[in-house]
């Protein structure tokens, strides 16, 4: 498997630190609001990458943090007249809800900044002790001039960065590029005791400290959105490597922007959509399919027309799945013919093509193209005349390859929730004496193969 490493600007063979194991960290959200679908793209890519690494036989430990103390959280808390932790806890819950609707599984560990304060303070103290950071009026800054490789991730020299740095009035910093590791307390803001007085951590140090605590001083894969290359990830490398004297991460992966009218989707431009807004028009699995149908490093221009096209593509895969499920229910346990044996053997080539495609810098777009080729092959060879074994082999491979990407998961659980929702809607219609709507819901469900039975214990349903 090869991955494009932002650090080296080239594809490299993926060789984990420890054979068969992967330690991966992705920067998570600052929890002051609902995340938008531009953020969702990054979360989905790392979710799918983790699934694929597991599929390829790796034991993956995946960490994605929550930034639960931040200026934006404090600002919103003040606007609403509540404590900052009330805001962060609310939007952590909302994150998990929205992530779930997009098929994003929970990371192995979701650390919060506020639960790792001792580790953060110890990290800052070590940097001060080693001469890489200095205290100034209750703040602690990282001394960029003491880290010679600063700029290696973003491919910028220290001289160029200094020349381009905005002239800011900060008498406490030695250099405009020096960044805060610890910020002294302000009235009315959350703070923690430290050797430099009460305060709270800077943004960059949080991820370094949590990655070290949960994954070690050197990790396999670190990543996030493309907007994090500089300064966030650049600063993480500087402080982590200055602290440990070791390489921080072997592979740096960054996800391309999701654009609207060729401009990056962002809250600051107010050109964003949340998953909840998209769900008013589309099943959110269509959004996942749309995102994974492009290479993760390429920017995507978002539009409803493109999402509609993605829906049509995903519908074709569902049609293939549904056809095979119908054939499975009706297939005869007959002997496998020689032609079928050749067909079943030939299915392996699609699995190999899929792995070859996705192994090449996690190219899910080409992987999905292989899945469509597989469906076409199945459609041209499988019918009611085939043995159950041939149908099963086709179905199993389709579900295996789509499952790796978290696709074709709708049915089962989602179907049950939808049925229960429609039953509740029908009950309300009957209470309101809206019998036309009540009958329509019953008939619509019957068309989908679901029969409702009114009993003394309430409405029950069964499949035809």
Swiss-Prot record:
Signal peptide: none annotated. It catalyses: tRNA(Cys) + L-cysteine + ATP = L-cysteinyl-tRNA(Cys) + AMP + diphosphate. Zn(2+) binds at residues 27, 207, 232, 236. A motif ('KMSKS' region) lies at residues 264-268. It is found in: Cytoplasm. One of its GO terms (molecular function) is cysteine-tRNA ligase activity. The keyword Repeat does not apply. Keywords: Aminoacyl-tRNA synthetase, ATP-binding, Cytoplasm, Ligase, Metal-binding, Nucleotide-binding, Protein biosynthesis, Zinc. It comes from the Bacteria. The keyword Hydrolase does not apply. This is Cysteine--tRNA ligase. It comes from Alkaliphilus oremlandii (strain OhILAs) (Clostridium oremlandii (strain OhILAs)).
